[in-house]
């Protein structure tokens, strides 16, 4: 099944973007060719850009504090596995403390003069060639072990933010209930009855050859399934589509 997610607000949209960027960063920062590490460095700067556009640290801390208060209220509640609850609260405490205990996310990277210079060069198409920045060219020719160690050092200041965003999204996703739905003639809509949701998740069997185009507000969601054929624009299908959906509101 292919999973598609749609955020109901800009805060969750920012979380999803950071999740995507962190996934790409950690993948390309592993052992590999210097070209993989080029992508890792560029993605590192993308994350810095994303964190500068909004106060993501404050947002995710507020979300986790709210979740922690809700979980603490379940202590000694009948039917709740207390060992699992205490384990989750301890994990949440470590995550919150790790992020709250540091300053601005990624600040050491902004104070690294060489990285600041490289970030400026990478903002120019083709600007980090050996002609423009020979020190970066030399770095790419260092041993794989040295490059990996540097990347681990540079990603370390962002780990607390990654862990906090990952936990916030995990708790949000776990709040939804997955259900089987049929989109008649390729379309589906649902009234939300005034309940506030934060994330819509849609699963599609890839064998159906379609993808969802989603729009939503606090009153209603619309899902239209389309297919892409060659170079033509995607076209909405007119057949029934089986899919699964979950509405999340942690």
Curated annotation (Swiss-Prot):
It comes from Bordetella petrii (strain ATCC BAA-461 / DSM 12804 / CCUG 43448). This is Cell division protein ZapD. It comes from the Bacteria. It is found in: Cytoplasm. Keywords: Cell cycle, Cell division, Cytoplasm, Septation. GO terms for cellular component: cell division site; cytoplasm. The keyword ATP-binding does not apply. SUPFAM superfamilies: YacF-like.
């Amino acid at each position: 099944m292919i999973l598609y997610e749609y955020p109901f607000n800009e805060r969750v949209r920012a979380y999803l973007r950071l999740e995507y960027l962190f996934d790409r960063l950690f993948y390309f920062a592993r052992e590999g060719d210097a070209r993989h590490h080029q992508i890792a460095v560029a993605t590192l700067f993308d994350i810095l850009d994303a964190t500068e556009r909004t106060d993501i640290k404050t947002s995710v801390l507020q979300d986790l504090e709210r979740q922690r208060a809700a979980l603490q209220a379940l202590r000694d509640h009948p039917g709740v596995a207390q060992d699992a609850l205490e384990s989750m609260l301890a994990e949440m405490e470590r995550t919150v403390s790790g992020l709250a205990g540091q300053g601005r996310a990624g600040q050491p990277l902004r104070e690294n003069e060489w990285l600041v210079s490289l970030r400026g060069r990478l903002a120019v198409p083709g600007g980090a060639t050996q002609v423009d920045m020979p020190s970066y060219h030399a770095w790419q020719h260092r041993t794989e072990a040295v490059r990996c160690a540097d990347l681990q050092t540079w990603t370390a200041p962002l780990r607390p933010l990654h862990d906090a965003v990952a936990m916030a999204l995990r708790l949000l996703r776990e709040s939804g209930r997955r259900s089987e739905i049929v989109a008649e003639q390729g379309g589906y809509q649902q009234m939300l009855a005034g309940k506030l949701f934060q994330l819509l998740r849609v699963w599609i069997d890839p064998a159906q050859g379609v993808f969802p185009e989603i729009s939503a507000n606090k009153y209603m969601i619309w899902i239209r399934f389309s297919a892409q054929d060659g170079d033509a624009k995607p076209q909405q299908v007119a057949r029934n589509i089986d899919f699964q959906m979950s509405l999340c509101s942690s």
